[in-house]
Amino acid sequence: MAGRGGELTEALVKKTGREEEDELGMKEKVWIESKKLWVVAAPAIFTRYSTFGVSMVTQAFIGHLGPTELAAYSITFTILLRFSNGILLGMAGALGTLCGQAYGAKQYQMLGIYLQRSWIVLTGGTICLMPVFIFAGPILLALGQEERIVRVARVLALWVIGINFSFVPSFTCQMFLQAQSKNKIISYVTAVSLGLHVFFSWLLVAHFNFGITGAMTSMLIAFWLPIIVQLLYVTCGGCKDTWRGFSMLAFKDLWPVLKLSLSSGGMLCLELWYNSVLVLLTGNLKNAEVALDALAICISINALEMMIALGFLAAVSVRVSNELGSGNPKGAKFATLIAVFTSLSIGIVLFFVFLFLRGRISYIFTTSEAVAAEVADLSPLLAFSILLNSVQPVLSGVAIGAGWQGYVAYVNLACYYLVGIPIGVILGYVVGLQVKGVWIGMLFGIFVQTCVLTVMTLRTDWDQQVSTSLRNINRWVVPESRDANQISSEE
């Protein structure tokens, strides 16, 4: 009877809190939701820029070793590491769904168990991806790369195995901490790591002349240092409510986590590989050198803006999953609206900035007049890419928060690879629009995908989503009173 009374009291408290929230004016609601959004988005954006900075610093130091080394680095990271990164980051997205909804439902003891289950699943995935790096030489030769570049890339690929394994604790700890809006710590340590990486790269490459060995050693330190700090923070008191120690329960109910991880991996890697396909298609066009240089500049600019959008993807997935887990359908819908509006507002500003600047911004990256002219010609497409990318990742974040990854994977496959790429091939090769035609086709694929996700979001029954989320939470939950490090005989 006492337990029943406790449940009733908790329900009344929740209801009273909701009623107070409903009585707030629209300005106050927007302000409160925006603060919750930026608490996750700002550190997520900063972390992505710091991680991107580590790669850029390494590229700069390796570039001074020679053009062959630079080409090998670019191929290794653009083709091999992006391939595995897309899969593992996508698979970690499942943890964002599970932890976010469990945290919203106040089932705090489950977050640590979900984290450990994701470590098991992603470690298995990383081991399965190892042959890609071990046999990098034959793979790159089969893709038509020059043998002299492949010889260096083969060495780099073995170093990258260590970076690939760092993604397991890195991505999972990020999702675990983001679900609790505690990801500030990640931004602090990645900033320090970037500064140390610059110093160690100079020391090992420029001062001691250790070449590729020095550059990759510094990079490994830069990737693993933040992870060590995050793991210490999680396991040594920074998350007392959600980390209850290592548990044998991590080995139970792995199948639902694996299924959701595979759906998440399919959803995100199909998005991340899309730009790689654009580069491959452009490389086969006539007079591709100038086009590739211009496209590389445009993609670099687009990637910088994309980090803002990916920050909002992380934030809205947390907000939606938290609200669904807490049984608040209105809150999930409102969080979606605020995230889309905020990201779209930033996208509109950047859209007009790049339309106005056109080719002038290219002189930051090149001194070639031909390349600058090509960038100016591509600037309208770059501006539209930035505009679309301010909405599409946010809607993908809503999908992660709600657990729709499997559906969105099919949407991405159809829109990108059955619509966007074929249209790009026709416009680029048949109609003769060259790189512009390929990009228009790819943009059309993104536009169709954005429209489909928008319709899916608008037609969502949020009350039904709450019921589905709570049903899943109750199915997998471990009672808090139970010893988390034991599995009872009846199980």
Swiss-Prot record:
Q: Name one GO cellular component term.
A: membrane
Q: Which CDD domains match?
A: MATE_eukaryotic (cd13132)
MF terms from GO for this chain are: antiporter activity; xenobiotic transmembrane transporter activity
Look up the domain of life of the source: Eukaryota
Q: Would the keyword Transport turn up in this protein's UniProt record? A: yes
Q: Keyword annotations for this protein?
A: Membrane, Transmembrane, Transmembrane helix, Transport
Task: Tell where it localizes.
Answer: Membrane
Q: Where are the transmembrane segments?
A: 37-57, 75-95, 120-140, 156-176, 185-205, 214-234, 265-285, 296-316, 337-357, 381-401, 413-433, 438-458
Q: What is its main location?
A: membrane
Q: Which BP terms from GO are recorded? A: xenobiotic detoxification by transmembrane export across the plasma membrane
Keyword Nucleotide-binding attached? no
Q: How does it sit in the membrane?
A: Multi-pass membrane protein
What family, per the record?
Belongs to the multi antimicrobial extrusion (MATE) (TC 2.A.66.1) family.
The identity of this protein, by name, is Protein DETOXIFICATION 20
